[in-house]
Amino acid sequence: MPMDQSISSPLFPMEKDIDIPLDATPLAQSSSLQLFIHLAEPVVFLQGFDPQKTEYPSVVLRGCLVVRILKPTKLKSISLSFKGYSRTEWPEGIPPKRQEFVEIKDIVDHTWALYPPTEQKSKKKMDASAPNESNNAANNFLTKESGASLYRTLSDNETITSRKNSISGLSSLNLSPLGAPGNSSVNVKDRESRQRSRSSSVTSSNGPSRNLSPINLLKRATSPSVSHHNYKPTTTSIFSDLLNNTFTHNDAASHHGHHIPTSSNHLAMTSNNFTSGSGGEFFVFQPGDYIYAFEELIPQAYPESIKADFGFVEYFLFASIERPGAFKSNISARQVVNIVRTQAHNSVEESEPIIISRDWENQLYYDIVIASKDIILDAFLPITFKFAPLDKVTLHRIRIYVTETMEYYCREKKVHRMEPTKKFLLTEQKGPKLPNLPNDANLSKAKNMGNLLQDPKNGDLVNKEYEYQIFIPSRFNNHQQLHPDTSYENIKANHWIKICLRLSRVVDNKRKHYEISIDSPIHVLHRLCSHANTLLPSYDGHPASFPKETDSSISSILESSDDNINLYHNSNIFFPKEVLSSPVLSPNVQPLDILIPHLPSTSLTRNSRQFNRNSKSHPSDNTIFNSAKLKSNIYQPESLQRELASPQAIPLSPITSPMSNMEVPPPDFDFSSDFISDAASGTTTTEVSSSESSILPRDPPSYKDTVLHDNNQKRRPNSKHPTPPSLKASHPNKNSDKNSSETLNKKESMSKIEENKHKRETTPKKRENRDVKSLSTPQREESKDSTSTGNQSNEKNRKRVLSLSSSLHSSPNNSGFAHSALGNLSNESLRSLNRRESVQDNLPSTIRHDNPFFTDLNQVLIEDELKNHDKNELNRHSTNTSSTPASARSSFDYSGINISKDKLNMEPLLSKTETLTNKVNEDSFLRPNDSYVDLLEPSVDTTIDITAPYARNSSAWHPLQNDNDNNQFSPLLGSNENFLNAANAQNSAESDHNNDIFTQGSGLTESSKNSDSEERFISRLSSPEKVLINTLDNESGLQSINESTL
């Protein structure tokens, strides 16, 4: 951007549309141009009624002047002025001479010289010989020479309506700029002389011949360019162009390429077309819209717009276009700017009520609460009365007035005049009609009214409370109006609220009437000072949700009342909830059109209100305005603008709040992308449908079922690292059915052996696991044919759930397909799973995970000892062996115990109901014949000795735990190899002894084997080995379940 270029005009706001419709009515027009003034904010708001306070910042008046050229036109100047003045009228004459009857004072007068630009006048000779080589340069030249912020071509709608079939008129003209190809022989002097003679065509030696009839000349003069054919401007493109043209007129031509005419008639614009002074040449404005943006700061000390009976304050924008020629008239337009004054943002008068509490001559105590010190025109004001009669007193009538006093000043406040006070009745509450009145009695007289304090049931004087929603109209009977408060020193408007109570009492056997009058000053604000214009927009969403129905009946409004929930808020005291749900609220108003319409709410007289109330054609009036709070109003609104009743401002930004999106419930999770993988083969089986996977099980497998099934799947007799179970989604294996039948036979024989053992030894169990029995004997011999199919399907579903649970417990990363696998199970099969002793019955602190990443501190610290595992490990030879290194915080050596990593998943460390004896009995219940050798392994206990602070570890973490004799406090605090060898030798000897016993007793029955193993187990609990070594629970009982149980 060149250094001599400056900002020509301010930006137009982004949220406003500056596109002028083709059918819009201009402020002024002629045959060649139209004039529009488009304001960004139709109303300017000032704060505070104290003109002495200047701490509030100035407000901005901004907008644009649009000059629409219909055909090429020469203009001499374009100017825009912002003017404001006050005028007071004095019919009796201004003292002392009384020869002047009007006083006018100027408030503001600011003028923008839009065309010609200032920099163009000083540089017109320098740019006279500058050629324009392209259409972009021609468009930049148009914008620069006209001084506009934005230039737009006319759309084809206007082309079709005003200049039909005239595109080829000027297309044949050769109007290329000087220096362009094909114009070397053009004589500049001849063309200047032709322009002075107002010729409408330019000849060229190389130009083609054409018909110069008047009709063709008219067509050529009014024809548009070909470039803007089929072009429809948008708000986004207009704003971007305005943004670019605001800061520079010499930007890249690509930003304005779509506005540049391509026909040759727009290229004949050089600086010699503009000449100032008499007899000079002027710039030719080509057809299109020339947009001039402007702004003006308005201080808070300026008075607001006032329109009183004997004075007013007015602001307006005045646009003037001067055209050259003696017979060309100037064009001017005028648009009023409305300035409204509202309360300051830190004012508390709106939220501060007026409270009046008095005692009238020890006869009546009353409280009056006026909800606010402000009144908004065409809105409601809540007022509450509370009466407590202290003696026999009669309250005949309640009236509420608003009074207005206008004062005028001139000659620096030396001359003053006050108008008579206007008094407007707003509400009247009358007592009930007295009985036995004559027919010709005047019902408006207070003596003919009953008592408002009397109970209608028994006739006693009781405490009464009345609530009113008083409507304050801006116009009364279409010829009187209530003016808002003013801050201008020469025109003052003051208002008071007046409450009148008509009382009577009996004095000396005569009834005397009294009138109590209560006056209080109150602010009356403009109708646009509602919360929709004074409060910030809501951050939770759109404050007003408008129904689409336009029916004015009360039924349609009530049906759409759910859409108006956000329209009402308790803080918006000026619009009660009853009115917001009534047809009075106009449904046809655009939600964002807040300030433009100024249609007043027409108020009704008392007679017309009574007529409408009693009319059968207005059922909505009977429903809404006959309520206790509204039926006493003298005036009723015919319509209220819906957007003005909003409790907060309506945002103009197209970006909505993210909180509003949270009101919509999220969609159901789609499990269609989840796959169930076969862990054994590593192949993907089938994909679970989203419809089936969305059904979660109502009765998931119990904790006991999961524990037992995990051991059935994981404990293999001759495998050190068992393979994970395979999970089939929808294609069960046929071989699994055969294995399941064999397993069921084995379980039946095992259950018979267990029953014989209990009958012989008469040792009852403390608790019987019904879930295990359901797995062991799901089928009976007497129902093989009738229920075999259903039981097999239920068994398959049960195994699928249990195998899924086993996979989830064994791997922390397998939770992705949990819901997918459960979705394929039927509801009946899921309900068949018992929920007794589920995982919810155990506290999280009593759960021990078998996964090394989620176990106790022993397994967390066990990784450090894996490096020295081969050095300190002493293996025990058994059927199913595994080695685990000792923990850094445990006093027990894991190396001498056969513990597999695949233990019971989610096994509770603390058991509430089971003892070790019962646990062994239950474990042996499902034990096959070839797995009883595991019972001969040393028994362990579930408790862990936390009093032993250190383990026997090669890497000491404390200075006292060293491998020297001086630091060994006990065999458990050091790494004494003698003690280790002695302990392991004893364990090896016991293991050999157990093997011998098993060899000798191989001919015993199964029950005798179980009995002997239980006796050894109980005797081992009291052995002295527990003094030196903390043992773990005998997990071999659950390890020995054969794989054939599947």
From Swiss-Prot:
Subcellular location(s) per record: Cytoplasm
A GO term from the CC aspect: early endosome
Biased amino acid composition, Low complexity: 128-140, 168-179, 198-210, 669-694, 802-811
Residue positions, PTM Phosphoserine: 155, 162, 213, 586, 826, 838, 900, 1022-1023
Feature: compositional bias, Basic and acidic residues: 734-785
Region (Disordered): 115-141, 168-230, 605-627, 651-820, 868-889, 986-1017
Pfam families: Arrestin_C (PF02752), Arrestin_N (PF00339)
Example GO BP: ubiquitin-dependent endocytosis
Assembly: Interacts with PCL6, PCL7 and RSP5.
Bias-annotated ranges (Polar residues): 605-614, 877-889, 996-1008
Encoding gene (name): ALY2
Family affiliation: Belongs to the ALY1 family.
Function statement: May regulate endocytosis by recruiting RSP5 ubiquitin ligase activity to specific plasma membrane proteins in response to extracellular stimuli.
Domain of life of the source: Eukaryota
GO-annotated molecular function: protein-macromolecule adaptor activity; ubiquitin protein ligase binding
Post-translational modification: Ubiquitinated by RSP5.
Database matches in InterPro entries: Arrestin-like_C, Arrestin-like_N, Arrestin_C-like, Arrestin_domain-protein, Ig_E-set
Comment field (misc): Present with 49 molecules/cell in log phase SD medium.
Key words, A-Z: Cytoplasm, Phosphoprotein, Ubl conjugation
Protein's UniProt name: Arrestin-related trafficking adapter 3
SMART domains registered for this protein in UniProt: Arrestin_C
